[in-house]
Swiss-Prot record:
Quaternary data: Homodimer.
Entry-linked Pfam families: ILV_EDD_C, ILVD_EDD_N
E.C. number(s) listed in UniProt: 4.2.1.9
One GO CC term on file: cytosol
Xref: InterPro entries: Dihydro-acid_dehy_C, DihydroxyA_deHydtase, DiOHA_6PGluconate_deHydtase_CS, ILV_EDD_C, ILV_EDD_N, IlvD/EDD_N
Cofactor binding, note field: Binds 1 [2Fe-2S] cluster per subunit. This cluster acts as a Lewis acid cofactor.
Chaperone in keyword set: no
Record's protein name: Dihydroxy-acid dehydratase
Gene3D superfamilies to which the protein is assigned, alphabetical: IlvD/EDD C-terminal domain-like (3.50.30.80)
Cofactor: [2Fe-2S] cluster; Mg(2+)
Catalyzed reactions per annotation: (2R)-2,3-dihydroxy-3-methylbutanoate = 3-methyl-2-oxobutanoate + H2O; (2R,3R)-2,3-dihydroxy-3-methylpentanoate = (S)-3-methyl-2-oxopentanoate + H2O
Amino acid sequence: MFPLRSRVTTVGRNAAGARALWRATGTKDNEFGKPIVAIVNSYTQFVPGHVHLKNVGDIVAEAVRAAGGVPKEFNTIAVDDGIAMGHGGMLYSLPSREIIADSVEYMVNAHTADAMVCISNCDKITPGMLNAALRLNIPAVFVSGGPMEAGKAVVADGIAHAPTDLITAITASAKDSVNDDQLLSIEQSACPTCGSCSGMFTANSMNCLTEALGLSLPGNGTTLATHTARRELFETAGKLVVDLCQRYYGEEDESVLPRNIATKKAFINAMALDMAMGGSTNTVLHTLAAAQEGEIDFDLSDIDALSHRIPCLSKVAPNGNYHIEDVHRAGGIPAILGELRRRDLLEKGVHTVLYKEMDSWLDDWDIRGGKATDKAIELFHAAPGGVRTTEPFSQSNRWDSLDTDQARGCIHDVDHAYSADGGLVILRGNLAPDGAVVKAAGVDESIWTFSGPARVVESQEEAVSIILDKQVQPGDVVVIRYEGPAGGPGMQEMLHPTSFLKGAGLGKACALITDGRFSGGTSGLSIGHISPEAAHGGLIGLVENGDTITIDIRNRSLNLDVDDAVIEQRRAAMLEREKPWTPTNRNRPVSKALRAYASMATSADKGAVRQLD
């Protein structure tokens, strides 16, 4: 039997002071000696994906207590990337991942919690809590707040936008053909309920990946926040975490620990899922960071290898017209994994918090596999309610039928894949010797090979300005540099530049490359995570206006077509500058908090984690 971590604060004479304080929080005498479960919540009124989580912690706590545990809740911060987008607030988004991970570690270790339930949802909160879970390596179950319903149809500029989402609104704002009244109509429809934004953006991508990693329950990534079916996920998570405590502390079963669930094989399966579902490029950053926290040998080369053999089976917004609610109707994550399993494209020998082997999990939950339980079939009938609300579990609508069409439905089988290669592709070349990432699922195949003159800017703001001022011409390659983890600092998302290019009708006529990153809502020929970044001496820092840049997605290359001798001349001139590898004409206030992150931040190929040694 392993001793509970919390014993140092609950058992023995020396713990009298701590017990006195525990009593002041409502702990009863008969609860001392039981496992203390941290309910790691992230409720905030700033974020639609978290606005409904205020009372959800109580549901988990009741389940923990009923199962024999002692629940204690605390909150982390949560940044809304959409609200922070396009201004200085985006500098704080990625660094907040590290703050969240640290705050979870601080609270859990300071108060000697024995296990935790992580109630996450949006872009950096799930990755931050995932990093913490793998760092702490105590029993943990993830249950996110759930996705938002897609917006209703809106007709504007002669086009029926059906259904709408956040990206619809941002793109429409850059279209001269959309008048203010039409834009308001789209805006009012785009985000109708609580929950993480309705497409296959970063938040939903990461919540889906927790299923494949084995740390959350089936349906976690796709069951709508508004649906009554989601309540059971929270209840089950509370019961399950106490069972995991018994297995670990009571039976010395180390298989239930996060590092023994989210193994290298599990990470490979998670990124295979991401390739198949056309997930956000940000998942690359976050899985690399999480693997390092768990001391797991998983790096960009593993992701690159997956992109060569995993087909793209789904195109969800912003890459297509489907939304997460449609993925759910088609069987959710078990259905996608099931399609991969049938072609022997998954790693075997993995398990989850709920199942001792993945095969059993998929047998029970893959509605296309022929063995799915009635419970699984019931869950995937959960449909949107179509009513504006910030309340969770507020409707119980059901789809009349499930989407099992493997040729034309939301989730294809391998024979009808959108492409033989995965939805994400790693590019290399002299511009990105350590790698760059493109969401190939969001790029029209007609521009998979692209060559054009560079249009260089040194901030996202400058990029937006030249696009809206119509200074970008068809055929240009917009280069946004010094926006990497250290150079930004904070590695801003470039959603506004890509959305405004699309809104200006240049979505298939231009490319955009950056050492920054992209929102999960980005589509088009948008290449990010260029490593090394400009601030770390990357070649992107030496590109000049008019230089030819060549992109070849099929051959996975990204190159600056300039003679080596010229490049070396530019490098020598850079090193002679008073402040080499810094922007020349950018006036950006940077706080102490951001400078601290920048001083330790690695480039994107390492997950933009802090390097302390």
